[in-house]
Every structure is written in C-alpha cells, then in structure tokens.
Design a protein with these regions (language model features):
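Short, composition-biased motifs enriched in small/polar/acidic residues
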Residues: 5-9, 13-15, 431-500
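Extracellular beta-propeller repeat domains
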Residues: 2-443
Length: 500
C-alpha cells in the first residue's frame, strides 16, 4: 500500500467529482450478509384462525423508532382479525398492542375495524393505520385508526362509507402537520374505483381529493386516470404522488400526482398494454406500491409486465418524463424459481444511490428475495433468497411483501407466510459495506463507508484455497463520509476485500 494521498490533486475534491460522474467498480468479495429471524408468528387454530400474536403480516412495512419496530398482521390475534404489534430490533419484547375485533352480521360492523393491511405511520408517539374492513358504517368498509406506541388510546378516528368517501383503505398513509393523506381501493362514486383523501389527525375534516371513475361500465374497464389504488402516497411540498394499480387507457395502471388541496390531478405515466398470452410489455403493469422520491426522480415497482411479465423496477421524473425500466425480473423455472425474484409488490427503500426492495416470489428457493440496485439500474444484487418450504414452513419465511426499514447497517422486514409455523416472520438482514475502486492515473483509490465499524481492508495476489490475506497497514483517510486508501498499480494482480 502506498499511503492515502491522491497523486495530481486534492483527494477530497477528486472523490466528490468522481462520485457524480464515474460508475464505481465493485472490488473483490465483501463479507456475507447476516440474516436473522426476530419473530415467528405462531400457529393458528384451523377453524377460527386465531392465535396470540397475529398471523400473516401482509403487504405491510415496519415502522422503526429507536430500537422498536411496529407493524400489523392481517389475520390472527385472539379474534382472528389481525393485530398491531411491536418488537425490539434484537427480537426481544414482542408485544401485541391491539387485537382487532370481529365484525357482526348482517352489516359487518364493529367499533375498531378488522384486517389491517396498509401498514403504519408514526407521528410523535402516535401510530396511524387503516383496516380493510369493519367500522361503524353498515357494510364494514374499513377504518382509519390511531393508538399510542405503548398500546394505549386506541381510537377508530374514521369509518369509511363507500360513497362518497371510498371503501377498503388498503395503502399506507402519509402525515404532514395535522393532516393525513391516503387512498381507498374501492368506491367513492357509483362507478368509482377508489379515492385519494385527506383527513385531520383527530378524524375530522375528511375530504375526497380525487375519485377514480370509469368510462365503461363493463369489463375491461377503461379511463384516463387509473383505478383501485393499492398503495400509499408520498408528499413533496404541496404535491402528492401515487400509483393506481388497474384501469387507465390500457388497463395496466398509472402513476399520478395531485395537489394536497385536490387540484391539478395529473397522470404522469400510463402503463402500456400487454402483448401476447403472457401479457409482456416494455414498462410493466399493475403498480401496487408507493413511490420513493429523490432529486426530482420517482422510483417504484410494477408487480407484473416487463420482458417476462414478472414485474419491473422503474424510475420517472416528477413531471412524467424520462420513464426508465431499471430492472425487469426474469422468467420463472417451473413457475417458481429464478435468480432475481419476481412480482415486486412493495415500495423501494432509497439510501444514497442505492435502492433496496423485495420480490414476492422467485429466487433460488422460490419464495422471494431481498435485493439492491443502483438508482441508475446497474448493480442488481440479491441480498437474500428465502428458502424452500416444506408443508408451508421453513427457516426464514416466504413471500416478503413488505417495505423495508433501515437502522444503521441493518434492514428489517416481514414475510407474509413461512417461518416455523407458516404464518410469517419478522426478520433482519445486516448489509456489509460495499468496497469500490476508483481508477486514478497510476493508482486506484479504494473506498468504503465510514459508518461500518470494525472492518479492515485486506489484499491478496491469490484467490485460491491457500490465499493469504494481508491487512492494510496504513490507516484510511476519511473523505466525504468514506474511508479512502490509495494503492499504486503494479504488475501483479491484486484482490481486495473488507474483513471484520
């Protein structure tokens, strides 16, 4: 090793410039990811689908606050209608914060709702969420609820009524000040297929900002704006961005924006028609997840469509221009197995220039994957492939239909099924640092993030079984949040790794 000084200029400014204009090259092999199951949801009774802790955290992400994770299960609990739970990031202290009650025939009503499917959002010490069904209005069209992070103060702050306010709030919420914004999947009008709404955090002032309606009353339905939004919204300034999973001009869904006062509803992208018996297309179909936003670009997932009708990852500018497919998931062998996963139904997580996400099925075990890729579409990497199941159970879970949460260098998520009892898991996945190489004249600069304690740079000239790895003797220079070591290029091929 030759020290840490870049030849021919200031290293700090050089790293700043190459981070913007060069594609970094992965160097060697980094430490393997560490996967852990934090909680296995317990077995349920065969007749009433009840248990003590909940079952099947379906299409729900975890909310992270300090060392506590908060989430929901669609089923289970003592009434079989779902739960709100908390668990520490080390897997300890799993607590049921609320168990939803069963609705009553013939009008399917209850006081608190049932089947929470849209996940939670945290404001201070208060959690907000939605239930797919139940509530006090006849028909049981779902609720909006709040409760404290300690499980106290549960309140159903709104019961949906189908018309005009919509029904079945299935997506996540976004909170800004004293306002909550969300979507309902159904109704809102006679020919309605869902709404965008706002409501005060105390449940007052419910307002429909937009109703998705169809121009044809028979299937296949058609319109310009889409329908049945299955996802939450994101907020930037006074503009909300979201997806509608179905309908639109080609019946494959849309991406839209709308002002928080309900003005200026705009379709940013219409997903194109499928071709042939497998419904393949160029841009994807059925976007079921919320978007993420960075520097004027939206990133998201479409659960179907693409080259093999197995879903895509995409980006698009906030004005609707420059739509790009970042990754099209590959075909499945035997209807289940591939290398990268298939049918992504959850939002992406953005950290710097890296996107993290989950694919619902596929992978080498056939039960889904956790993946990462760069925002430009390069570097797609499977971080974890969920294991095959035997009679519905396995070691790590199956069907990860979840938004990932990140704390430090660890991702947290849920699986809908699988695990020790077949009812899903809460998991963690440690992500090791990425070692990168920047060519610099006669040298190479090796960098890795400074927030990874205990990792050292090692090198070898032989990758065989007898390889001897030598720890770099010179300490790295810290530049722009990166450890940086400069190494002179010699005639001998050298391999590098990070070791802990």
């Amino acid at each position: 090793m030759s020290g840490v000084t870049h030849r021919g200029g200031d290293l700090r400014s050089y790293l700043s410039s190459v981070a913007c204009f060069l594609t970094l090259i992965l160097a060697g092999r980094v430490t393997a990811q560490t996967f852990a199951v934090l909680h296995n949801f317990s077995a349920t009774s065969s007749d009433s689908y009840t248990n003590w802790d909940g079952a099947q955290p379906y299409q729900t992400g975890l909310v992270l606050s300090g060392t506590s994770l908060y989430g929901t299960t669609l089923y289970g609990g003592v009434n079989g209608r779902g739960t709100v739970f908390s668990v520490n990031t080390n897997g300890n202290d799993f607590t049921v914060l609320h168990t939803f009650s069963a609705s009553q025939s013939p009008d399917y009503t209850n006081l608190d709702g049932e089947y929470p499917q849209g996940g939670l959002v945290l404001l201070g010490d208060t959690l907000y969420g939605t239930t797919l069904n139940g509530g006090t209005n006849s028909g049981g069209y779902g609720t909006l609820f709040s409760l404290g992070t300690n499980g106290t103060g549960f309140t159903a702050i709104q019961s949906f009524d189908s018309i005009p306010n919509g029904s079945n709030p299935n997506g996540g919420l976004v909170v800004s000040g004293n306002k909550i914004y969300g979507t309902t999947q159904e109704s809102g009008a006679t020919n309605g297929f869902g709404t965008v709404f706002s409501v005060n955090t105390d449940g007052t002032g419910l307002e429909v900002l937009h109703t998705f309606t169809v121009t044809t009353t028979n299937y296949p339905y058609a319109n310009e704006d889409g329908g049945e939004p299955d996802s939450g919204l994101i907020l930037s300034g006074d503009t909300l961005y979201g997806t509608a999973q179905f309908i639109g001009p080609y019946a494959n869904g849309t991406i839209f924006s709308i002002k928080t006062n309900g003005a200026d509803f705009t379709v940013l992208h219409t997903f194109t028609a499928g071709i042939g018996p497998y419904n393949t297309n160029a841009d994807g179909a059925f976007p079921r997840a919320a978007l993420v936003l960075s520097c004027g670009t939206l990133y998201g997932t479409a659960s179907f469509g693409g080259d093999y009708d197995k879903g895509v990852l995409f980006s698009v500018s906030t004005n609707g221009s420059d739509f790009k497919v970042l990754h099209a998931f590959t075909d499945l062998d035997g209807g289940r197995f591939n290398l990268d996963g298939a049918f992504p139904t959850a939002p992406l997580l953005l950290l710097g220039n890296t996107l993290y996400g989950t694919a619902n099925v596929g992978g080498v075990g056939g039960n889904g994957t956790v993946f990462s890729l760069n925002t430009g579409g390069s570097g797609f990497t499977v971080l974890h492939s969920f294991a095959a199941t035997s009679f519905g159970t396995n070691s790590d879970g199956m069907y990860p239909e979840c938004t990932l949460a990140l704390s430090g260098n660890t991702l947290y998520g849920t699986t809908e099924q699988g695990g020790a009892y077949g009812n899903g898991t809460v998991f963690s996945l440690f992500i090791p640092p990425q070692l990168t190489i920047i060519p610099s004249g006669p040298d190479v600069i090796l960098t890795w993030p400074t927030n990874y304690a205990g990792f050292t740079l090692q090198s070898t000239t032989n990758l065989g079984p007898s390889a001897v790895w030598t720890t770099n003797s010179a300490g790295p220079l810290v530049v722009n949040g990166q450890n940086a070591v400069t190494n002179s290029i010699s005639g001998t091929q050298t391999f590098f790794r990070l070791s802990q």
